[in-house]
Amino acid sequence: MGRFIFMSFGFLVVFLSLSGTAADCPSDWSSYEGHCYKPFSEPKNWADAENFCTQQHAGGHLVSFQSSEEADFVVKLAFQTFGHSIFWMGLSNVWNQCNWQWSNAAMLRYKAWAEESYCVYFKSTNNKWRSRACRMMAQFVCEFQA
């Protein structure tokens, strides 16, 4: 009987140590598919939010979505945490890398862009993306790989 209890306990310890990746995330972060996520309520502009995320954990950044399932998880997390709001994600046009072309197919050689850059946010009510000036304030979600 003692041997059975000992072996059962051993299997339980092994099972618990191998199950789930939630243990890889800090206790106040949420885990999904090997990544850790946390919404933050203090509004920041896009650059300050990205900088803040890099300081939270090694490899941290504003959230980036690799699938609709991941986006659904993060949108639900943001809504459950703060209700209706908008949240920055890591997508932006800060470096103005768009390949613009004139309607007559001529290459864009002369540029006179305003200093405004645009960054992407999502609403916590759906996972539809929108852009706005990066200088605007919004809540945000940080992410790092567990």
UniProtKB/Swiss-Prot annotation:
**What further fact does the record state?**
Calcium is required for ligand binding.
The record's family statement is:
Belongs to the snaclec family.
| Organism whose genome encodes this protein | Protobothrops flavoviridis
Q: Where is the signal peptide?
A: 1-23
Identification of the protein by name: Snaclec coagulation factor IX/factor X-binding protein subunit B
- Please provide, in alphabetical order, the Gene Ontology terms of the cellular component aspect for this entry: extracellular region
The protein's matches in PANTHER family, at most eight in alphabetical order, are given as: MANNOSE, PHOSPHOLIPASE, LECTIN RECEPTOR RELATED
| InterPro entries (alphabetical) | C-type_lectin-like, C-type_lectin-like/link_sf, C-type_lectin/snaclec_domain, C-type_lectin_CS, CTDL_fold
**Principal location class:** secreted
Tissue-level expression reads:
Expressed by the venom gland.
GO terms for molecular function, please?
A: calcium ion binding; toxin activity
Arranged from A to Z, the UniProt key words for this protein are: Blood coagulation cascade inhibiting toxin, Calcium, Disulfide bond, Hemostasis impairing toxin, Metal-binding, Secreted, Signal, Toxin
Question: Where, by residue number, does Ca(2+) bind?
Answer: 64, 66, 70, 143
Q: Which SMART domains match?
A: CLECT
User: Which segments constitute the C-type lectin domain?
Assistant: 24-146
Q: Which cysteines are joined by disulfide bonds?
A: 25-36, 53-142, 119-134
Q: Name one Pfam family in it.
A: Lectin_C
